[in-house]
Each structure stands twice: as structure tokens, then as C-alpha cells.
Amino acid sequence: YTEVDTLSLHDALPICNQYGGVLNDPILLRISQDEFWFSLSDSDIGLYLQGVNHDNRFNVTIDEIDVSPVQIQGPKSLALMKDLIGDQVELDNMPFYGLAEAKVGGRDCVISQSGFSGEAGYEIYLRDSTLYADDMWNAVLEAGKKHNLMVIAPAHHRRIQAGILSWGQDMDNQHNPFQCNLGYQVSLSGKGEWNKTADYVGKEVLEKMRDQIRAGEKPYKLQLVGLSLGGKPIEEYAPDFWLISEDGKEPCGFITSPWYHPEQGRNIAMGYVPFDGTLSKNGFPIGKEGTKYKVHLPDRKSTRLNSSHLLIS
């Protein structure tokens, strides 16, 4: 929903492509005056973008490029990045979602202060990655030695705590932006001020839904919320959704992403519960804090859940 002509050079903003349902939640990077990259989540959006421009209404070329990302995340990420790229980029002054060009392992890269953790972190986009992946990768490992760098999959408890969604796990094209807490991305200002005049795919549907929500109607049944979950620490990613109910009755929703949070000393999760019409001060749908549910685990006893507001980073 981002108006791309407002993006600065070497800047980036999160956007969400949708047509009623969310097709993808990429980051849009403006590399130069007339060059934009979509850093995609777990769905193929290239053919969709080409389809939007099937009649050549926009004077653009849409194609997949030979670029691959690597993330450096965590409290030591700044120090590691300084060792990795030296003074090529003023990292201390780089804003969140800021972009810069740099060489890593002697290869051309784009650096973005962003990531999938909710913590301090950076993403390295390697150009011509099929040719130079080893050069970049080995340089990262070498710079990370003194920082005790670990090569791991995403730390899900971090992104769950920060309210960072995983497409295909927490939402997909069956969900609209409002019910998965992305409604703020639809408005121009991000503060609930719907003053965007430019057209975009799904605008009529979403603006109608916005009006229904503000009028106290419920255009959908389930709302994504943050949850705290009792019981033993969850040590493995859930292979399927866990159903939840009110007081052991028929299932009324489901958990999408559960994980143990070591600092909080409890299990946290995201899940869909019945939408009761509760809105934030900016007019966006949220869950009602303190509502209790039961989770139904396969071959295990049910466990109490306490719902709270989903923390949006």
C-alpha cells in the first residue's frame, strides 16, 4: 500500500500486497531512482506483479533478480557489521529500514537495517549471488568468529514477541490486513488516517471493511492476538495449528506460532480468537486483554491460555 514515489533513495518501507486477502508481506527497497526490489516472504509474488501490469499500464520491467539475503541479528550485530564492512557505511547513523551499498568479501551488496527478529539487526543482499555466495558467506563467518556468531534459523520467540508475522503460518490469502494486525499499513500515515488518494489493488474492499469496523460491525470472525501459554517450555515448532476453545467447548479459534520465551520464562504465541469488536485508540482491531481460552493439544491435556494485545513492533 506504499506510495513508491514518496520513498527516498536508499530507503525501505514495509508494504503488504493483497487483494482482500494478504498475498505476501514483503519489504520494498528503493535501490535507485527507478529501481525497486521486493524482499519477499514465503510466497511467489513475481507472477502476480507481472499480472497486475499485464496491460502495460506502468512503464516497468518486472523480473526475478540474482540477489540473495543473509541476516545478522542480535545485540552484537552492529559490532559484527563494523568488522565486516569497516567504514564503508556509517552504521551508527543508519535508520531502521535504511539502505546502503557496500562490499562484503569483495562482492557488491546492499545493506539494510532490518530483519526477522525484532532486535537490532541487518540484512545483507548479495548481488550475483549464484556466482559469489561463497565469498560473502565466508567473509561473514570470519568476521563473526570473535563475536561467537551462530548460524541458526530464525529465533521465533523474538519475532513472536515483536509481533512479526510469518506468511503461511500466521496469515495467508484467507486473511485480510485488519484481522492480522496489518491494518496500520493500509493507511497512508500509519496512524489510522485514511487519506491515501492513489489507487491500489483491493482499495474498495479494504475501505469498505474499514468503515464497517468503525461502525461497530464485524466483517470477519477471527482476530489475531498475542497469547501467553502455560505448561512446560515449548521446545519444537508446532507442526500444525492447535485448536483453542472457551471453557472446553467447541473450538473457536487456533494457535499459529507458539514458542518458549526464556527471558519471560513462559510460552508465548500468536493465534486467532473470536473478534469482539475491540479497537485500539487509532481505530484498529485488537484482542481484549485478559480473555481466557483452552488449547487442545494432540494426545495431551488442555492447558490454560491468557490472551493479551499483540505487540506490533
Roles of regions detected by a PLM:
Residues 23-26:
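Short beta-strand and beta-hairpin "edge-sheet" elements
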Residues 8-15, 21:
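Acidic, proline/glycine-enriched N-terminal capping motif
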Residues 1-11, 305-313:
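Single conserved hydrophobic/aromatic residue that forms the stacking wall/gate
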Residues 29-306:
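Conserved, structured C-terminal
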